[in-house]
A protein has these predicted regions:
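Catalytic core of membrane glycerolipid acyltransferases/transacylases, capturing the structured
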Residues: 1-53, 61
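Non-catalytic C-terminal accessory region of glycerolipid acyltransferases
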Residues: 59-174
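Catalytic centers of nucleases
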Residues: 56
Length: 174
């Protein structure tokens, strides 16, 4: 499961460039019905999710994909972050739930600079992480929230490490 922050529609292409295998995407259900992009979304295997979080079929479809050994990319913020802030939007919990229920590793990635036309976008991928401390036990909503916070902390860490490396590089160049 690829899990990252979300700035724009083009963010979906970053995880796709890291794998030769196909990749599915978890996205809002309305994408599948959009006039132009809907056909493309269906063709690349988008799994539509209802925004209210009550769609059991979405979870079941995603679990089936993962259990078949296929990959999913998702943005746990649930929508594009248009705030201009460095803070991530609140995570909605689905990524940790899927990783735990299917015992699938999470590949965290962070988009360090918002994509801009004709500008370099920096995307950092972390090492796969397991949420194995949550496997094979009865979990509470607080447990899922803690797992999701662990993922969010890893994204912040990846971005902080990238920025520290960039600052050190600039300092050496002076």
């Amino acid at each position: 499961i690829y899990v990252g922050n979300h700035y724009c529609l083009w963010d979906v292409f970053f995880p796709a460039h890291t794998t030769k295998d196909g990749i599915h995407y978890l996205a809002k259900d309305s994408i599948l019905h959009a006039p132009v992009i809907g056909g493309w979304a269906k063709g690349v295997g988008v799994i539509g999710a209802m925004r209210d979080g009550t769609d059991v079929h979405t979870v079941m479809d995603a679990m089936r994909v993962l259990k078949n050994g296929e990959k999913i990319s998702m943005f746990p913020e649930g929508t594009r972050n248009k705030t201009g802030s460095d803070e991530f939007l609140p995570f909605h919990g689905g990524s940790a739930l899927l990783a735990i229920k299917t015992k699938t590793p999470v590949i965290p990635f962070v988009i360090c600079t918002p994509p801009r036309f004709l500008r370099r976008t920096h995307v950092v991928f972390g090492e796969p992480m397991e949420l194995s401390e949550y496997y094979d036990r009865k979990l509470t909503p607080a447990d899922y929230e803690a797992a999701e916070e662990k993922l969010k902390a890893r994204l912040y860490e990846l971005r902080a490490n990238f920025r520290a490396e960039q600052a050190a590089k600039k300092k050496r160049e002076k």
